Amino acid sequence: MLVQLGAAVAVLAVTAGVGPTGRFDVPVNGFAAATTVLREGSPESVGLDPAPIEAAKATIAGSPLFPGAVTLLAHDGVIVDRTATGKAVRYADATTELPAEQQVPMRVDTIFDVASVTKLFTSIAVLGLVEDGKVDIEKPVSTYLPEFGVNGKATITVKHLLTHTSGLEPFIPLWRDYPDKAARIKAVMDHAPSAPPGSVYTYSDLNLITLGVLVERQRGESLDSVVTKRITTPLGLTDTGYNPPASKRDRIAATEYQTTPARGMVRGEVHDENAWSLGGVAGHAGVFSTAEDLAVLGQTILNGGTYRGKRILREATVREMLTNHNAAYPGNAHGLGFELDQRWYMGGLAGPRTAGHTGFTGTSLVLDPASRSIAVLLTNRVHPVRTNGSINSAREALASGLARALAVRPRQGPTAWYTATGGATLLTGPLRSTGPVSVSFAAFVDTDAGDSLVVEFEDGGEWRALPLRVSGPGAPEQEVSGLSGSGHRSWWTVHAIGPVGAPVTVRWRYVTDSRYSGRGVTLDRITVTDSRRILLDGEKQPHLIRPLGWGPKTR
């Protein structure tokens, strides 16, 4: 049976929580209405700012890391943008570009090998077994696959596999070292873990290969048949499945030109060598899909497991998929199938409830229950070779573009100061005080853990940080030297005490590293006082504040 819900998912217990459309600063609890069906619309129709979306699309269109891409963004049940850019097929081999007339343009309905996004389909199939009473995730895998319980794996549970805490290593070259499918599956069943079960987080294809076998054994039919009957057909995902038919080849994006094994330019067959050696159907890879089909899957999850009247999972099961079961492994939050709160590809949408997955071929799906938003990025980044480099910057850019399109309303008045740029400063002029200076302001902070907003005063030509006292949902309980964090999606009230002396100059500085970013920082209600008077009222005297990298925003 499913594990008991913890306090971490209590916020999802209320179905169809109501919140204003287009807002980042008013997180929504519960699932979307079960009747929500994706429809076409504009960003403006659901209260989004189109400018950050266009900026993100420009970043992706200009990326040298992949020949082409399809993006899809949805909010509150509305597809606000879908765009195709570049080429679905550009190369004849590892280095030779096709003549221009032979290259295949990307289309919004191009079909992609989604690689490890397949793991979500397998996880849903496993949880269907749980709902049917055929599997208990707390029981050893060997309960259902007796041959698995050898070589130190007797205590590995189904939950360990779903959360990548089994101790199994990431990968073994089944396609190279074993002669046929039966031998390859046996190799997985026989393989010894590299760490004790439950002692470490290690993302492993072997976990999901095993779960695929478990699904087949318990259902008495092939994994692709189970996925078709229980997921893609009910949801109407007509372009999603394994081993796509030849009739759809013209719409399929090419992946890699492979020489070992000697497969040539791979198009319409799974790119992953192990999945290919297993007949194209495996628990870890093999699914092909489109941006729209993945968006429908995402909306199904946001709806609590149902779409167009077809339920594929119960709400309680979906809550478990969106619950962090890996609290013991900071930075590796994971539900039952979904990754959670991964800034490196979820960007400004990242938060404790944000769910998603990526694929090696250059794919990603991000679901943000707090704003009921979806970001899909599908690329052919391994075309023509897998050494093209990481596309995480593009993944992050798309998700952050959607996050920045969502509004954060000023705390007071028509505008607030906003930045998403590292090194940005807000600077007051010299303020003449007669005693200790008190600085207060409202801050909306959504940053990577390594980034922070600091408040400083000038002291003899040097800048010194002021200690900050913060209040509000999710605010630090102790005095801090800088503001950082994400997931709370709420305004904080901040106070600091400055030095005695005149004149005093105060600055707010957003300090970032070179890794990942959040939605950014918004400041409002800036006030500087001494014991006798108001030295600066930012609402009435914005001309006394000099912005460098900040700008006034209405949202």
Label the model's feature ranges.
Residues 1-23:
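Secretory targeting and sorting signals
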Residues 29-31, 83, 88-90, 94, ...:
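Short, surface-exposed loop or secondary-structure junction motifs
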Residues 38-112, 136:
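Short, conserved catalytic-motif segment at the N-terminal edge
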Residues 49, 119, 290:
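Short, conserved phosphate/pyrophosphate- and ester-handling motifs at nucleotide-, phospho-/glycolipid
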Residues 53-60, 71, 77, 110-139, ...:
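Active-site SXXK
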Residues 70-73, 81-82, 113, 160-162, ...:
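Structural recognition of the beta-strand scaffold that forms the well-ordered cores
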Residues 136-152, 233-235:
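Short, glycine/proline-biased beta-turn/loop segments that scaffold the active-site neighborhood
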Residues 323-325, 351-352, 361-363, 370-373, ...:
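Beta-sandwich/jellyroll recognition modules and their flexible linkers
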